Swiss-Prot record:
Annotated function: Plays a critical role in recombination and DNA repair. Helps process Holliday junction (HJ) intermediates to mature products by catalyzing branch migration. Has replication fork regression activity, unwinds stalled or blocked replication forks to make a HJ that can be resolved by RuvC or RusA. Also rewinds unwound dsDNA in an ATP-dependent manner. Has double-stranded (ds)DNA unwinding activity characteristic of a DNA helicase with 3'-5' polarity in vitro on linear dsDNA; branched duplex DNA (Y-DNA) substrates adopt different conformations that influence which of the two arms are unwound.
GO biological process, one term: response to radiation
Cofactor: Mg(2+)
Protein name: ATP-dependent DNA helicase RecG
Gene designation: recG
Cofactor note: Requires Mg(2+) for branch migration of all tested DNA.
Source taxonomy: Bacteria, Pseudomonadati, Pseudomonadota, Gammaproteobacteria, Enterobacterales
Helicase ATP-binding domain boundaries: 283-448
Domain notes: The wedge domain within the N-terminus inserts into the replication fork junction, where the lagging and leading strand split.
Annotated binding of ATP, by residue: 296-303
Keyword Isomerase: yes
Entry-linked PANTHER family: ATP-DEPENDENT DNA HELICASE HOMOLOG RECG, CHLOROPLASTIC
InterPro entries: ATP-dep_DNA_helicase_RecG, DEAD/DEAH_box_helicase_dom, Helicase_ATP-bd, Helicase_C-like, NA-bd_OB-fold, P-loop_NTPase, RecG/Mfd, RecG_dom3_C
Catalysed reaction, written as an equation: Couples ATP hydrolysis with the unwinding of duplex DNA by translocating in the 3'-5' direction; ATP + H2O = ADP + phosphate + H(+)
EC number(s) on file: 5.6.2.4
Length: 693
């Protein structure tokens, strides 16, 4: 193995890695020894010195050593093993809920034990629940760790101890095999070498300040952060360069349809809408595919911008596809576009996963023949059996639900006769600038930063759940006395449609009993699209006073007469999602209110979140705060897609580096194409597939 590059050494060559463990490691994208070395600790534990048991404070993680006094199993309520140890300064109780007979036998009275865990205050003094422990041999001095102990991101069935043992082997291989230095010499001068940085981060010496590691300021981290941010930026440059190699249909100015639609509208587009449409039209006139992200706050009128872009393509005899994240939103878009486009003689088709049999087949034929010029749907519109007829523009609504990989797969899908469609991506989740510069560096960005006239800011109040009866009275007053409509939103912490639906049904029953004079509707994610649509339609037509809903109404629902929203358990949602929900009211000229009905006690973070919503109606301010509170991955909705999942970099903490990283990435992209490719392969193997497309 001597002299081999570690990206070519499979993990199966390490001792103890068989087929079963290989499969588990593959789930966290660990295939080679290089992958393992770049799988960095989440945090560290200091197990290098002993704490006297008598000095343990609650909440402190510590290593203690003591002699076993007794070890007992109790069966009251829950089966449990307790073991007491003493070091002369005090007694510690170790509690285990999962244990075996072998564990009980190893902890015999008189044995010496080294244990590590979080100290808690128990009934009989200090205790630790499920500490890691080791029975000591006959040594008079305990065997303490010589380095800080790493804690790695892991997956089911892979223990920390396994990852530590494998990493030990991988670090040993650094002596005989190479991990390639990919930074050009002018960049890496004065920096730690890559092997040095990896050794330091996997096995930090006890002299190293934990605070340096926790804040990401250690030179070993800075070395890897720079490399990872460069790889990310280089992948975006490669995607952009790739896009420039493709051909799109140039769609020159043809404003006949656009002017007809504008003349029929009861309002004039805002200056911001007009500016963004001009930016889009400029892109669509070119023979390379447009890749543009349009950000607009809730209610800023993105749908009209999308419609005007669509008309440019349709005027040239081409097709347009609009993809939305949910069937409810897709159907609402289809209805909006039909209202605008039918008078212009344009046929709008709708395609969703739930459509079956003849109806689906008929819709597919209408798309393939070109009879339908505008196709609206969920991701179902990009399934194999859907054939387009001159698709020239793809519009993706709520980009934030689709990661970089979906964005690219969709693009490959749309190409026909050597042409790639133009792409327009719309999000109502404003993205802070530093994040947009990094996560969407392959896209040009437009911002609709002006609300249409006649919108009123929503007044937001936070009220404890103990005053629920007062809030129900407030709903009665708004609906009966003021003639308004209201939403009551149920949220659940579990990502479970079933539990969420059950919670909404229970609330619906409660409110029907409490408000017998009101017509109360219910909509949740487990209802059939037709049922949801019927409820939404009767709410929109004013037949229902109150709509009980889950977060399915988060995006796109437009009922101007609704001026009151109650959000239950708002502490369970992020700021961006709460702001989206709140955007369902305040769509008419009447003063609107949003009540955040929270459960006490509130955590510090939840208090900050609710305060931000009370203070601001500006989506961009809220997004920046959300980034500060939650971190970039959650904000981009990419915990699943891996788009913002960095191994060592942190977009919030490292944002000051981003402008310099972008400059360096351009330098490497132009001067060192081989290194650029290798950096992307090392840090972002998924993206590499696409930049070669």
């Amino acid at each position: 193995m001597k002299g081999r590059l570690l990206d070519a050494v499979p993990l199966s060559s390490l001792t103890g890695v068989g087929a079963a463990l290989s499969n588990k490691l593959a789930k966290i994208n660990l295939h080679t020894v290089q992958d393992l070395l770049l799988h960095l600790p989440l945090r560290y534990e200091d197990r290098t010195h002993l704490y006297p048991i008598g000095e343990l404070l609650p909440g402190v993680y510590a290593t203690v050593e003591g002699e076993v006094l007794n070890c007992n199993i109790s069966f009251g309520g829950r089966r449990m093993m307790t073991c007491q140890i003493s070091d002369g300064s005090g007694i510690l109780t170790m509690r285990f809920f999962n244990f075996s007979a072998a564990m009980k036998n190893s902890l015999a009275a008189g044995r010496r034990v080294l244990a590590y865990g979080e100290a808690k205050r128990g009934k009989y003094g200090a205790e630790m629940i499920h500490p890691e422990y080791r029975v000591q041999g006959d040594l008079s001095t305990p065997e303490l760790q010589e380095t800080l102990t790493p804690v790695y991101p892991t997956t089911e069935g892979v223990k920390q101890a396994t990852l530590r043992k494998l990493t030990d082997q991988a670090l040993d291989l650094l002596d005989t095999c190479a991990i390639e230095e990919l930074l050009p010499p002018e960049l890496s001068q004065g920096m730690m070498t890559l092997p040095e940085a990896l050794r330091t981060l996997h096995r930090p010496p006890p002299t190293l300040q934990l605070s340096d590691l926790e804040t990401g300021q250690h030179p070993a981290q800075r070395r890897l952060i720079l490399e990872e941010l460069l790889a990310h930026n280089l992948s975006m440059l490669a995607l952009r360069a790739g896009a420039q190699r493709f051909h799109a249909q140039p769609l020159s100015a043809n404003d006949t349809l656009k002017n007809k639609l504008l003349a029929a509208l009861p309002f004039k587009p805002t200056g911001a809408q007009a500016r963004v449409v001009a930016e889009i039209e400029r892109d669509m006139a070119l023979d390379v595919p447009m890749m543009r992200l349009v950000q607009g706050d809730v209610g800023s009128g993105k749908t009209l911008v999308a419609a005007l872009a669509a008309l440019r393509a349709i005027a040239h005899g081409k097709q347009v596809a609009l993809m939305a994240p949910t069937e409810l939103l897709a159907e609402q878009h289809a209805n909006n576009f039909r209202n605008w486009f039918a008078p212009l003689g344009i046929e709008v088709g709708w395609l969703a996963g739930k459509q079956k049999g003849k109806a689906r087949l008929a819709q597919q034929e209408a798309i393939a023949s070109g009879q339908v010029q505008m196709i609206v749907g969920t991701h179902a519109i990009f399934q194999e059996q859907v054939q387009f007829n001159g698709l020239a523009l793809v519009i993706i609504d709520e980009q934030h639900r689709f990661g970089v990989h979906q964005r690219l797969a969709l693009w490959e899908k749309g190409q026909q006769q050597g042409f790639h469609p133009h792409q327009l991506i719309m999000t109502a989740t404003p993205i802070p600038r530093t994040l947009a510069m990094t996560a969407y560096a392959d896209l040009d960005t437009s911002v609709i930063d002006e609300l249409p006239p006649g919108r009123t800011p929503v007044t937001t109040v936070a009220i404890p759940d103990t005053r629920r009866t007062d809030i129900i009275d407030r709903v009665h007053h708004a609906c009966i006395t003021e003639g308004r409509q209201a939403y009551w939103v149920c949220t659940l912490i579990e990502e479970s449609e079933l539990l969420e639906a059950q919670a909404a049904e229970a609330t619906w029953e409660e409110l029907k009993l409490a408000l017998p004079e009101l017509n109360v509707g219910l909509v949740h994610g487990r209802m059939k699209p037709a049922e949801k649509q019927a409820v939404m339609a009767s709410f929109k037509q004013g037949e229902l006073h109150l709509l009980v809903a889950t977060t399915v109404i988060e995006v796109g629902v437009d009922v101007p007469n609704a001026s009151l929203m109650i959000i239950e358990n708002p502490e369970r949602l992020g700021l961006a999602q709460l702001h989206q929900l709140r955007g369902r009211v305040g769509r008419g000229a009447v003063a609107s209110h949003c009540v955040l009905l929270y459960k006490t006690p509130l955590s510090k973070t939840a208090q900050i979140r609710l305060q931000v919503l009370r203070d601001s109606n500006d989506g961009f301010v809220i997004a920046q705060k959300d980034l500060e509170i939650r971190g970039p991955g959650e904000l981009l909705g990419t915990r699943q897609t891996g788009n913002a999942e960095f191994k060592v970099a942190d977009l919030l903490r490292d944002q000051a580096m981003i402008p310099e990283v972008q400059r360096l990435a351009r330098h490497i992209h132009e001067r060192y194409p081989q290194q650029a490719k290798a950096l992307i392969e090392r840090w972002m193997p998924e993206t590499e597939r696409y930049s070669n497309a």
